């Protein structure tokens, strides 16, 4: 058996290698601390997919196995794309999970749907600035994706399409499911730039923390975050705490302040009101004349990102000033109501102009807590 230190790095698969008698390695797409992602081609159909390979000799055990578990939970859910081959967990000679043994094989892998460019890459191509139209529509997709993940009892933690640090926030016993009790002092887990201010205090992360990450990401779509140039996680945490919601969302539609006000009303145990956040984002679309079928910024050829629907409609609502303790009564804050008779509801907006998921999708509470 290879020594642990010799095999703990990213898995290197030569181009042309056939894995599991089915997948031929075509190109290397990227790598991390203990894994690598490859472009592969199925021998029989020439269909292309992404393969993530992970060393079996990584201290702390497999994280790929957790990713597969999350993807299996997501299988069959609306608008969720898990894996090209049912998230099957296999080792380097193609056996199923019941026969898996990390002691006998150098690496493990899973084959997944091949997607296009990452959002990070598209953001860079757009000179690190998205229009309000793109910002809000991406926010809707992120919101629904997080809700789906929360419904299958996992938190995102790293806020990425990979689930290597995801954590289940419930306990299952005797056929019952209940939320875990929060720990007093946890390890710092997450992406420093986007994790919630709460995470910096080593407090237990819950569903609201994932949504704070969403808000930070949406804010960055319109301009650099206040801590963008900082590298020390303690300094970043301190800056997050002293940044007001108005400062954070300075270049975003003012309606988004109602989202942060709602998040500040939550604690670890409280379920976020996904429907409320959905309504806020939808109202922002309507007030800024944004159609869901509009092209995203990266789809527009020869047009500056600053053109078109990039300016915030500051006249559509009046947002109350957030106090220094950042606690705001959500009911006192005004945004365009989706119940207004002169304003279309999500169901009245023509297909192609509204999101592919509905208010009912956002309101559904599968866990009951």
Task: Provide a role label for each language-model segment.
Residues 160-192:
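Activation segment/activation loop of eukaryotic-type protein kinase catalytic domains
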Residues 52-56:
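Conserved beta3-strand ATP-binding lysine motif
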Residues 138-139:
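Activation segment signature within eukaryotic-like protein kinase domains
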Residues 244-251, 278-279, 286-369:
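Extended, low-complexity, intrinsically disordered C-terminal regulatory tails
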């Amino acid at each position: 058996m290879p020594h642990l230190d010799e095999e703990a790095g990213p898995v290197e698969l030569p181009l042309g290698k056939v894995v599991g008698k089915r997948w031929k390695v075509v190109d290397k797409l990227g790598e991390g601390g203990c894994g690598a992602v490859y472009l592969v081609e199925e021998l029989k159909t020439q269909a292309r997919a992404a393969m993530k390979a992970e060393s079996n000799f990584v201290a702390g055990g497999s994280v790929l196995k957790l990713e597969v578990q999350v993807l299996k939970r997501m299988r069959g859910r609306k608008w969720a794309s898990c894996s090209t081959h049912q998230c099957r967990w296999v080792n380097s000679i193609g056996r199923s999970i019941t026969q898996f043994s990390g002691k006998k094989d150098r690496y493990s892998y899973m084959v997944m749907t091949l997607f296009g460019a990452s959002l990070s890459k598209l953001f860079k191509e757009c000179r690190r600035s998205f229009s309000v139209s793109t910002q809000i529509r991406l926010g809707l997709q992120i919101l629904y994706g997080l809700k789906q993940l929360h419904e299958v009892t996992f938190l995102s933690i790293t806020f990425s399409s990979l689930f290597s640090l995801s954590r289940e926030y419930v306990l299952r016993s005797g056929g019952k499911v209940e939320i875990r009790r929060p720990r007093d002092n946890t390890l710092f887990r997450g992406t420093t730039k986007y994790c919630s201010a709460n995470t910096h205090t080593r407090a237990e992360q819950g569903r609201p923390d994932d949504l704070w990450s969403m808000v930070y990401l949406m804010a960055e779509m319109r301009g650099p975050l206040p801590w963008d140039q900082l590298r020390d996680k303690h300094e970043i945490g301190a800056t997050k705490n002293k940044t007001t919601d108005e400062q954070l969302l300075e270049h975003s539609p003012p309606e988004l302040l109602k989202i942060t006000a709602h998040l500040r009303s939550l604690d670890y145990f409280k379920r976020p009101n996904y429907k409320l956040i959905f309504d806020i984002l939808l109202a922002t679309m309507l007030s800024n004349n944004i159609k869901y079928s509009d092209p995203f910024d990266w789809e527009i050829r020869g047009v500056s990102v600053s053109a078109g629907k990039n300016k915030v409609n500051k006249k559509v609502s009046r947002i109350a000033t957030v106090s220094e303790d950042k606690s705001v009564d959500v009911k006192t804050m005004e945004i365009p109501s989706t119940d207004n008779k002169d304003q279309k509801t999500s169901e009245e907006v023509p297909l192609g102009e509204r999101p592919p998921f509905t208010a009912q999708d956002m309101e559904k509470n599968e866990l009951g807590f």
